[in-house]
């Protein structure tokens, strides 16, 4: 049976790419599109909605969300309340929000996924970085994205940092008397190490984790040159959440 999918934020770069992915998979059916700024009533026979309240009672299985951080939590909560398994690529969630959504999914026995990054290579980078941090505890994260990205640091950088924190002995890096002569020069601090955000036109999504030790260094890097790189993960997420009974944070939990 085909999985019926709603795509929220379908007019954005990621949303429009997700629409094409769903349309190209015989196991998926594009059931509805949502965007508050949409002027059209339908696209290729698929109904378009501007208000999610109009989707109450709608016949669909999965809610794919590529909107903006300001509405992503509310959208995901709405999806769970109305029986749609959410697959969310929008970033900017707090730990408290993720916990509330996880608890709600358990109450509803509905699967779901919030993923800072859907590229398989990025997931591997996170895993490799966490493993390396056991042996190279001095590190810094540099994430680079297009200049239209609203949140910083990226969800991928935060997730990478969280995975590292789970296995790395906490320590404060740098000189004890370190002083910034220009505020923010050292980046954001997370568990004693630093995260840096770069925003430039022409970039898509890139991240490197740099490790340093006496006499040697190690650099791990992943590059997404095109948004199509995320679609294999989105596709996997859609097909997996309908089999599960609670929301997970991170695509690695479905691999």
Curated annotation (Swiss-Prot):
(S)-2,3,4,5-tetrahydrodipicolinate binds at residues 146, 155-156. Its EC number is 1.17.1.8. It is an enzyme of class 1 (oxidoreductase). Keywords: Amino-acid biosynthesis, Cytoplasm, Diaminopimelate biosynthesis, Lysine biosynthesis, NAD, NADP, Oxidoreductase. It catalyses: (S)-2,3,4,5-tetrahydrodipicolinate + NAD(+) + H2O = (2S,4S)-4-hydroxy-2,3,4,5-tetrahydrodipicolinate + NADH + H(+); (S)-2,3,4,5-tetrahydrodipicolinate + NADP(+) + H2O = (2S,4S)-4-hydroxy-2,3,4,5-tetrahydrodipicolinate + NADPH + H(+). GO terms for molecular function: 4-hydroxy-tetrahydrodipicolinate reductase; NAD binding; NADP binding; oxidoreductase activity, acting on CH or CH2 groups, NAD or NADP as acceptor. Gene3D superfamilies: Dihydrodipicolinate Reductase, domain 2, NAD(P)-binding Rossmann-like Domain. It comes from the Bacteria. Disulfide bonds: none annotated. Its main location: cytoplasm. Pathway: Amino-acid biosynthesis; L-lysine biosynthesis via DAP pathway; (S)-tetrahydrodipicolinate from L-aspartate: step 4/4. The active site is at residues 145, 149. One of its GO terms (biological process) is diaminopimelate biosynthetic process. NAD(+) binds at residues 9-14, 89-91, 115-118. GO terms for cellular component: cytosol. It is found in: Cytoplasm. Belongs to the DapB family. Catalyzes the conversion of 4-hydroxy-tetrahydrodipicolinate (HTPA) to tetrahydrodipicolinate. This is 4-hydroxy-tetrahydrodipicolinate reductase.
């Amino acid at each position: 049976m085909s999985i019926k999918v709603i795509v929220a934020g379908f007019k954005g770069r990621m949303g429009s790419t997700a629409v094409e992915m769903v349309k190209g998979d015989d196991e998926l059916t594009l059931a509805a599109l949502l965007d508050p700024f949409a002027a059209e009533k339908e696209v290729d026979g698929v109904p378009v909605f501007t208000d999610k309240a109009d989707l109450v009672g709608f016949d669909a299985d999965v809610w794919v969300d590529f909107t903006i951080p300001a509405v992503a939590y509310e959208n995901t909560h709405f999806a769970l309340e109305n029986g749609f398994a959410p697959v969310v690529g929008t970033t900017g969630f707090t730990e408290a929000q993720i916990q509330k959504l996880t608890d709600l999914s358990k109450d509803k026995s509905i699967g779901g996924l919030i993923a800072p990054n859907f590229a398989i290579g990025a997931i591997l980078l996170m895993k490799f970085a966490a493993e390396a941090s056991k042996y190279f505890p001095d590190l810094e994260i540099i994430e680079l994205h297009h200049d239209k990205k609203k949140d910083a640091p990226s969800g991928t950088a935060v997730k990478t940092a969280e995975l590292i924190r789970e296995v790395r002995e906490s320590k404060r890096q740098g000189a004890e008397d370190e002083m910034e002569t220009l505020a923010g020069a050292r980046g954001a601090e997370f568990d004693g190490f630093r995260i840096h955000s770069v925003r430039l036109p022409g970039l898509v999504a890139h991240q490197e984790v740099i490790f340093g030790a006496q006499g040697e260094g190690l650099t791990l890097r992943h590059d997404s040159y095109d948004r199509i790189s995320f679609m294999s993960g989105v596709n996997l997420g859609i097909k997996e959440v309908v089999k599960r009974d609670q929301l997970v944070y991170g695509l690695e939990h479905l691999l």
